[in-house]
Swiss-Prot record:
This is Glutamyl-tRNA(Gln) amidotransferase subunit D. GO terms for biological process: amino acid metabolic process; regulation of translational fidelity; translation. PROSITE patterns: ASN_GLN_ASE_1, ASN_GLN_ASE_2, ASN_GLN_ASE_3. Allows the formation of correctly charged Gln-tRNA(Gln) through the transamidation of misacylated Glu-tRNA(Gln) in organisms which lack glutaminyl-tRNA synthetase. The reaction takes place in the presence of glutamine and ATP through an activated gamma-phospho-Glu-tRNA(Gln). The GatDE system is specific for glutamate and does not act on aspartate. InterPro entries: AsnA_fam, Asp/glu_Ase-like_sf, Asparaginase/glutaminase-like, Asparaginase/glutaminase_AS2, Asparaginase_C, GatD, GatD_N, GatD_N_sf.
């Protein structure tokens, strides 16, 4: 990040630029080091120096004097090419980045950072990959996962489609963990694939000793070479590095803010465990799409506006009315218990369905399924053309309704799509063993 005008003026008075060695003097303090680029979101009055010790320090320029000691050049890293060991005997895998980098190269002596996402960067950080696959890597875009939108999902899906068409035997998506489960479920509905599509990420950055990035990436490579041709999420299965779980993309959810094993399969077990470079199916009775079972196809038609609304005590019916007034294409309700909402909002929900806005009911309990026949409030919703979607996750219902409403304007047809199990997102059987209580 460039320095603001105020700081630029402070530096230019002494003809100082990034890379120069400088001395900064304040009352009772003196520091000497190389001027670095300013990080994002740092204090507006702060300059950054790289000290001889290797540490970086931020200095507030208030009451400071600065002197150029020697002229330098902007830090950069000279990188040697990497031997990718391309072989016809290995599968071709495409690793696509949606935000940041899987492997940034940092020169701790100069402070320079090489953030470009290329196959060479990836293989420098994880050279073991060349023993397992021919790696092609590229950045699709560079955003924080909380800034993900349906338009980015479309671009990701189209890039995946092109990579498979160009000969990729498997796809790995590097993605921020916060909204990874939304993206996984959205891709599940937009793509039929003959090869595995695996999303992975890290809870701890790759420069930390406790990082999960390497283990997750290596496990994802094995998943992308496997026979499981679905959209999946591959992340740590435990807090240590013993194994990773492979979750169905429409059934996974981030369940902890910081644990490395944050992702959990809801209302089913993970499809597989990946341990010591081996992919083991957890339950042979669970059906999954196998490699080359489906022809490659892409359908990125999504509705423009679908809302996901959580029910809570005291919710105002105006919240529903706003989406109706703005002609939303659909509403997903995250209801209480078996799929309930307060009497106060039923009139507004009825207004939505009467104006041909499909309304779908899920449960904020996550585990278990909706059943709107048990209590009177649920039956009233059923009578007013609200449908329950069983054990489907709220986030999955949101992405599925976006896709369903993008296929047709007919509410009955949208409801039929929502009630049909397309990508393993819902099931008529449910084991109590899937409930996590510890």
């Amino acid at each position: 990040m460039a320095y603001e005008e105020y700081l630029k003026d402070f530096l230019e008075i002494s003809n100082i630029t990034v890379g120069d060695t400088v001395k900064v003097t304040k009352p009772h303090i003196e520091h000497e080091g190389m001027l670095l680029e300013k990080p994002d979101y740092s204090n507006e009055n702060t300059i950054i120096l790289k000290l001889d010790s290797g540490y970086n320090i931020g200095i507030d320029i208030k009451d400071a004097k600065i002197e150029k000691i020697s002229e330098g050049k902007k830090p950069q890293i000279e990188l040697d090419p990497v031997d990718k060991k391309i072989s016809d005997k290995k599968k071709n895998l495409s690793i696509l980045s949606t935000g940041g980098t899987v492997a940034s190269v940092i020169d701790y002596k100069t402070g320079a950072v090489h953030p470009a996402f290329t196959a060479d960067d990836l293989l420098r950080a994880t050279p073991e990959l060349v023993d397992y696959a021919n790696i092609n890597a590229k950045a699709i875009f560079n955003i924080l996962s909380e800034n993900m939108t349906p338009e980015y999902w479309k671009k990701t899906a189209t890039t995946i489609y092109d990579e498979i068409n160009n000969g990729a035997d498997g796809i790995i998506i590097a993605h921020g963990t916060d909204t990874m489960h939304y993206t996984a479920s959205a891709l599940s509905f937009m793509i039929d694939s003959p090869v595995p599509i695996v999303l992975t990420g890290a809870q701890r950055s790759s420069d930390r000793p406790s990082s999960d990035a390497f283990t997750n990436l290596m496990a994802s490579v094995n998943a992308a070479k496997s026979d499981i041709a679905e959209v999946t999420i591959c992340m740590h299965g435990t807090e240590d590095d013993s194994y990773c779980d492979l979750h169905r993309g429409t059934r996974a959810r981030k369940m902890h803010t910081s644990r490395r094993d944050t992702f959990t399969s809801i209302n089913m077990n993970p499809l597989a465990r990946i341990e010591n470079n081996k992919v083991t199916i957890n339950d042979t009775q669970v059906k999954y799409t196998k490699r080359n079972e489906k022809e490659l196809s892409l359908n990125t038609n999504l509705a423009d506006k679908v809302a996901l609304i959580k029910m809570y005590p005291g919710i105002s019916p105006e919240i529903i009315d706003i989406y109706v007034d703005k002609n939303y294409d659909g509403i997903v309700i995250e209801g209480t218990g078996l799929g309930h909402c307060s009497d106060d909002v039923i009139t507004s929900i009825t207004r939505a369905t009467s104006e041909d806005i499909p309304v779908v009911m899920t449960s904020q309990c996550l585990f278990g399924r909706t059943n709107m026949n048990v209590y009177s409030s649920g039956r009233r919703l059923l009578q007013n053309n609200v449908i329950g979607v069983g054990d489907m996750l709220p986030e999955t219902a949101y992405t599925k309704l976006l896709w369903a409403a993008g296929q047709t304007d007919n509410v009955s047809e949208i409801y039929e799509i929502m009630k049909t199990n397309l990508k393993g997102e819902m099931d008529t059987t449910l084991s109590q063993n899937y409930f996590i209580k510890n």
